[in-house]
C-alpha cells in the first residue's frame, strides 16, 4: 500500500525511531573542518553543480549549530587538540566524516613526525571517504551512506 492510500484513510502509523531518524537524515548540518586540498573538493560539493541542499545538507559556520563534522585534509599533531575541542562543542547526536587519504590514515605524509595517522585516533569516525583528493561525487556518496546509517540506528533506548 502506498502512502497516498494510507493518507486517504486519515492516519499514518510509524515508530518514533523511524520518524526521528527520518527528520535527522533530511537536515544534516555539517561543519567544515578543511585542513588541506580536500577542502576544495568539499566546497565543490556545495556549489550548484552538485547542490547538497537537495539532500538537506546546509553548511554551518559554528560547531554548536552542526551535527556532522567533515574532516578534510592532513591532520597534524598541532591541530589535533583543536579538532577534539571543536568535536566536543558539537551537540549530540553528532557524526564525523573523514574525507581523503590524509584524514583517513595520514596519506602521503603518513611517515612524517608531525602528522596524525588518521583522524580516528582523535575523534570517532562514522564514514570514511577514500581518495586523494576524493571527488565531490565521492563526498556526496559518503553523505548518502551516513544518512543510511542514521536510518538504521535506534534512537530510543529499549
UniProtKB/Swiss-Prot annotation:
Residues annotated to bind [4Fe-4S] cluster: 37-38, 102, 132
UniProt keyword Transport, yes or no: yes
EC number of the protein: 7.1.1.-
Cofactor(s) needed: [4Fe-4S] cluster
Entries under Gene3D superfamilies matching the protein: 3.40.50.12280
Secretion signal span: none
UniProt keyword annotations, A-Z: 4Fe-4S, Cell inner membrane, Cell membrane, Iron, Iron-sulfur, Membrane, Metal-binding, NAD, Quinone, Translocase, Transport, Ubiquinone
Localization, UniProt: Cell inner membrane
PROSITE patterns, A to Z: COMPLEX1_20K
Disulfide-bond pairs as recorded: none
Membrane topology: Peripheral membrane protein
Record-level GO BP terms: aerobic respiration; electron transport coupled proton transport
Chief place of localization: membrane
SUPFAM superfamilies referenced in this protein's UniProt entry, alphabetically: HydA/Nqo6-like (SSF56770)
GO molecular function: 4 iron, 4 sulfur cluster binding; iron ion binding; NADH dehydrogenase (ubiquinone) activity; NADH:ubiquinone reductase (non-electrogenic) activity; quinone binding
Iron as UniProt keyword: yes
Catalyzed reactions per annotation: a quinone + NADH + 5 H(+)(in) = a quinol + NAD(+) + 4 H(+)(out)
Subunit organization: NDH-1 is composed of 14 different subunits. Subunits NuoB, C, D, E, F, and G constitute the peripheral sector of the complex.
NCBIfam families: nuoB_fam, PRK06411.1
Family the UniProt entry places it in: Belongs to the complex I 20 kDa subunit family.
The protein's role, per its UniProt record: NDH-1 shuttles electrons from NADH, via FMN and iron-sulfur (Fe-S) centers, to quinones in the respiratory chain. Couples the redox reaction to proton translocation (for every two electrons transferred, four hydrogen ions are translocated across the cytoplasmic membrane), and thus conserves the redox energy in a proton gradient.
HAMAP family given in the database record: NDH1_NuoB
Protein name: NADH-quinone oxidoreductase subunit B
Species of provenance: Dechloromonas aromatica (strain RCB)
Amino acid at each position: 500500500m502506498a502512502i497516498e492510500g494510507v493518507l486517504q484513510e486519515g492516519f499514518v502509523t510509524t515508530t518514533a525511531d523511524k520518524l526521528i531518524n527520518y527528520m535527522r537524515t533530511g537536515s544534516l548540518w555539517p561543519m567544515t573542518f578543511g585542513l588541506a586540498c580536500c577542502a576544495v573538493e568539499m566546497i565543490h560539493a556545495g556549489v550548484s553543480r552538485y547542490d547538497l541542499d537537495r539532500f538537506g545538507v546546509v553548511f554551518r559556520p559554528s560547531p554548536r549549530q552542526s551535527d556532522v563534522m567533515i574532516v578534510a585534509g592532513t591532520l597534524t599533531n598541532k591541530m589535533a587538540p583543536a579538532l577534539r575541542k571543536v568535536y566536543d562543542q558539537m551537540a549530540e547526536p553528532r557524526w564525523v566524516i573523514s574525507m581523503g587519504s590524509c584524514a583517513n590514515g595520514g596519506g602521503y605524509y603518513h611517515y612524517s613526525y608531525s602528522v596524525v595517522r588518521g583522524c580516528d585516533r582523535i575523534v570517532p569516525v562514522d564514514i570514511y571517504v577514500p581518495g586523494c583528493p576524493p571527488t565531490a561525487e565521492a563526498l556526496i556518496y559518503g553523505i548518502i551512506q551516513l544518512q543510511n546509517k542514521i536510518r538504521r540506528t535506534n534512537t530510543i533506548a529499549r
